[in-house]
Every structure is written in structure tokens, then in C-alpha cells.
């Protein structure tokens, strides 16, 4: 256990989940929360018209100098809830290596760094991103320029603390643990414990979707007399999310997939699968049918994953085929719908997946395919949600119109996948195998 293990106690509770704002009270502004003008102007430029509930409740507490635990549903705007107070404290007393933000995944870390740079643009904030899959030397050079803020994944940060000459966090003033439950799910616990022993006394913000026993232990080890703010409840989905399921034969899943995509042509959608193989197969099949689909999964190189996300964000591709590597933490605006092509194994993952749409007050739709083999799993998910989800029943004749074209595209995808496997089997090294997977999107640049 770290030297900070005695820092806290039971957190003070603020803003219970059942609390609702008075109907006679106008929405607060960032200025009313105590945010300074230059940061308010940055919020306006980014389209932050009014604080979200997590921002409204967390920012004043953070500005008072308290340690903070924020529990909020995905898409709630929590990044700005910790970045704004952190930047305001930096402006009050500027210094190098002022703040450290830890995130569980490279993609989430990159998004947080982008938010820090955007909100801090008017005050010339220097932010450095430390993640795996990128060159250590380039990152060490960036650290040598003494940034104000570091956004990192735990493993890469520890690499630099142990190996980059002259780098330390002795003067650190703020620590943020974002997606803390995910950090612990990914077995970063031992690394976090080691990092906490290296860090000085500081203000700490911990944000999480859930408050598990592991997160409770991390809170006790890292926070001092914290205030807990909760704007979510267990197994909650966004209020403007419309959910439905399709009970279909397993062998017809691709037919129903193409039917739904055709019905929603031009909209932004994320299709979740259970395996890397299925992600690759669907990407190839759908592109052969004229759908602008791109894959993202854990076996892609970091540069390829970021390239896929950037194309999707830029709307040059409107279908993202994803494993659960993309189900959590990714801030992708304006996703119109989510489709669970393969059901997740538990309700927690279901909530994280469908939380990619209906974000920050917007509406969205979540479809789920339920086959004859998944009825029990679906009933468990419904039970955890605490409600029955409406069934969506397309006319079978309208679906089967696509059968011949889909069958042809399935054959092309199978041949392409076989060719890729043959290349793997001919002794190509890991780098080349990964590059081959990256080439799934090479045909449309």
C-alpha cells in the first residue's frame, strides 16, 4: 500500500442521485460556477453552452480545493468537470508538471489531451501525451520542454519515471484518475500503487462509472477527505436513449444487419462485435456492399486505431465496427445509433456500449441482435436494466431482399480473410501481420 493509504476516510456525500433541479431555477452558467472568463470563453468556442449535471456539481467543489470523487454515466461531460478546475488552479499559480491525468486506454488519453489543449488554448497550456505505441524518445523530448499537464496511461508513465533522465513529478499539484474502475479492471492496480508512492501530496480527483470495492480501496489510498458527487445510478442508461432488440435466426444476422444499415443510410453508427475476426469480416463485407465501414480493435496498431477514429469523427466514414476496445471512454460526438451485432456477456458492458450514443443530452438509438442461442443472456441484461426492452420486428420479406447481395459479399469477405491468414502462415513477422490488418482500410485511404 502507498504512503497515502491513510489519506482519507469516508467521503462526504453531495447531490444524491434522486435530486432533481427546481423547475423555477434557470440553468447555471460556467461563470456562475466560478470559472474565470478566459476559460468560459474557451467553453463557448467549443460549444459548451451550459454545464452538464456532473460539471455543475463538481466544479464548485473542486474550485474550493477539495479532493473529489465523481460518479457519472458515460457521456456526461466529466472530462471538462476536472479539466476546468485544474486549469484554473494552474493559471492562479503557473508551474511546470502541475497536473497529471491517468486514463486506462490510449484512445481515451488522446481525447483528454485534446480537451486540455482546446480548453487551455487561450492560456497557452503545454500538454504532453504519454501512451504506449508511440516513440519513447519523442515523448522524452516533449517532457524536456517542461509541460504544464501530462496525460498518460499508467504503464508508459512509469516507463518514463524509471528511464527518462531528469523527469520526476516531485512538484505535482493535481492528480486525476479517470475511468478508475476501468483502470482497475485492466489490472493497473500494482502500477497505480507504485505511482502513488512516487507522487507528493496533491489534490486528487477520481472519476468512475461505478464504485466497486476495488475503486473504494483506490479512493482510500489516493484521496484525502474527499467529496463524492453522483449523478448516475447502477445499471442506468441515458434518458434519451431508445433501446430495442431484434429476435432473429443466427444464420440471418448479416441480412438483418444490412437491412438496418440501409434503413439508416448516412447516419453515424457503431456496430459492436465480440471478436477481432468478426470485426474484420464485417468491415470487409460491408465495404463490398458499399457501406463506408472501418474497423477498430485491440490487434490494430495504435496509429491504425487512431486513424480509424479520426476518419469516423471527421465523418469521412460513418460506420465503426468495433470490439469492446471502443466501448468505454471514447468521446465520439453525434453517434446516431449503436448496434450490438453480438450481445455483450454482461449488463455492465451493454451499458458502456450503448452509452456511445445519446450523449450529453442528445437522443440516440441502440439495437441489439438476439439469436436463439442468446435468449437467457438477453433476459439477464433486461433484468439488470430493470425493464423490458421493446422488440423491433421488420418484415422478413423486406429483409430477405438483400439476401443475394449479402451472400456474395460474405463469400468475398471469406476469401479475403483466407488470403490474410495464408500470408500470416507464410512466416510474416508480427509487425507485418499487424500491418496487414491495418490494410483493411487501405483501399479508401
Curated annotation (Swiss-Prot):
**By its UniProt entry, which Gene3D superfamilies does this protein fall under?**
P-loop containing nucleotide triphosphate hydrolases
Where it mainly occurs, coarsely classed, is: nucleus
* One Gene Ontology term of the molecular function aspect: RNA helicase activity
Q: Which reactions are catalysed by this chain?
A: ATP + H2O = ADP + phosphate + H(+)
Asked if the record carries the keyword Plastid, the reply is: no
Which parts of the sequence belong to the Helicase ATP-binding domain? 59-229
Provide the residue span(s) of the region labelled Disordered.
1-28, 415-445
Per the Swiss-Prot or TrEMBL annotation, the motif DEAD box is positioned at 178-181
Motif Q motif boundaries = 28-56
Q: Reply yes or no: does the keyword Nucleotide-binding apply.
A: yes
Q: Name one GO biological process term.
A: rRNA processing
Helicase C-terminal domain span? 240-400
The residues that hold ATP are 72-79
* Compositional bias (Low complexity): 17-28
E.C. number, please? 3.6.4.13
* Compartments it resides in: Nucleus
One Pfam short name? DEAD
What keywords were assigned to this record? ATP-binding, Helicase, Hydrolase, Nucleotide-binding, Nucleus, Ribosome biogenesis, RNA-binding, rRNA processing
Q: How does it assemble?
A: Interacts with the SSU processome.
User: What's noted about domains in the record?
Assistant: The Q motif is unique to and characteristic of the DEAD box family of RNA helicases and controls ATP binding and hydrolysis.
Member of which family?
Belongs to the DEAD box helicase family. DDX47/RRP3 subfamily.
Q: What is this protein called?
A: ATP-dependent rRNA helicase rrp3
Q: Which species expresses this protein natively? A: Aspergillus terreus (strain NIH 2624 / FGSC A1156)
Amino acid at each position: 500500500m502507498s504512503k497515502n493509504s491513510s489519506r482519507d476516510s469516508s467521503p462526504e456525500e453531495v447531490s444524491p442521485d434522486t435530486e432533481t433541479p427546481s423547475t423555477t431555477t434557470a440553468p447555471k452558467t460556467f461563470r456562475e460556477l466560478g470559472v474565470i472568463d478566459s476559460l468560459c470563453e474557451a467553453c463557448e468556442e467549443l460549444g459548451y453552452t451550459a454545464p452538464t449535471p456532473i460539471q455543475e456539481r463538481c466544479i464548485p467543489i473542486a474550485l474550493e480545493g477539495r479532493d473529489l470523487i465523481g460518479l457519472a454515466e458515460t457521456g456526461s461531460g466529466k472530462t471538462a468537470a476536472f479539466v476546468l478546475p485544474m486549469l484554473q488552479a494552474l493559471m492562479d499559480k503557473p508551474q511546470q508538471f502541475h497536473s497529471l491525468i491517468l486514463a486506462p486506454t490510449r484512445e481515451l488519453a488522446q481525447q483528454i489531451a485534446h480537451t486540455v489543449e482546446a480548453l487551455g488554448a487561450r492560456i497557452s497550456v503545454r500538454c504532453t501525451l504519454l501512451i504506449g505505441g508511440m516513440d519513447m524518445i519523442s515523448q522524452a523530448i516533449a517532457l524536456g520542454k517542461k509541460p504544464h499537464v501530462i496525460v498518460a496511461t499508467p504503464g508508459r508513465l512509469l516507463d518514463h519515471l524509471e528511464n527518462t533522465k531528469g523527469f520526476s513529478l516531485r512538484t505535482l499539484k493535481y492528480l486525476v484518475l479517470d475511468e478508475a474502475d476501468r483502470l482497475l479492471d485492466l489490472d493497473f492496480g500494482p502500477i497505480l500503487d507504485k505511482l502513488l508512492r512516487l507522487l507528493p501530496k496533491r489534490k486528487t480527483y477520481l472519476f468512475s462509472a461505478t464504485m466497486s470495492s476495488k475503486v473504494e480501496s483506490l479512493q482510500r489510498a489516493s484521496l484525502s477527505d474527499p467529496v463524492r458527487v453522483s449523478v448516475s445510478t447502477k445499471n442506468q442508461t441515458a434518458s434519451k436513449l431508445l433501446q430495442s432488440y431484434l429476435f432473429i435466426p443466427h444464420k440471418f444476422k448479416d441480412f438483418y444487419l444490412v437491412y438496418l444499415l440501409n434503413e439508416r443510410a448516412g447516419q453515424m453508427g457503431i456496430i459492436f462485435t465480440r471478436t477481432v475476426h468478426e470485426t474484420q469480416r464485417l468491415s470487409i463485407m460491408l465495404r463490398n456492399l458499399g457501406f463506408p465501414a472501418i474497423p477498430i480493435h485491440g490487434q490494430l496498431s495504435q496509429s491504425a486505431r487512431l486513424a480509424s477514429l479520426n476518419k469516423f469523427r471527421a465523418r469521412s466514414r460513418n460506420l465503426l465496427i468495433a470490439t469492446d476496445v471502443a466501448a468505454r471512454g471514447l468521446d465520439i460526438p453525434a453517434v446516431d445509433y449503436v448496434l450490438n451485432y453480438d450481445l455483450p456477456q454482461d449488463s455492465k458492458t451493454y451499458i458502456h456500449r450503448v452509452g456511445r450514443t445519446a450523449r450529453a443530452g442528445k437522443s440516440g438509438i441502440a439495437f441489439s441482435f438476439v439469436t436463439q442461442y442468446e435468449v437467457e443472456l438477453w433476459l439477464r441484461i433486461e433484468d439488470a436494466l430493470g425493464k423490458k426492452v421493446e422488440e423491433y420486428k421488420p418484415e422478413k420479406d423486406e429483409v430477405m431482399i438483400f439476401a443475394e447481395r449479402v451472400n456474395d459479399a460474405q463469400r468475398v469477405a471469406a476469401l479475403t480473410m483466407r488470403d490474410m491468414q495464408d500470408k500470416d502462415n507464410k512466416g510474416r513477422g508480427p509487425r507485418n501481420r499487424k500491418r496487414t490488418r491495418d490494410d483493411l482500410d487501405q483501399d479508401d485511404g
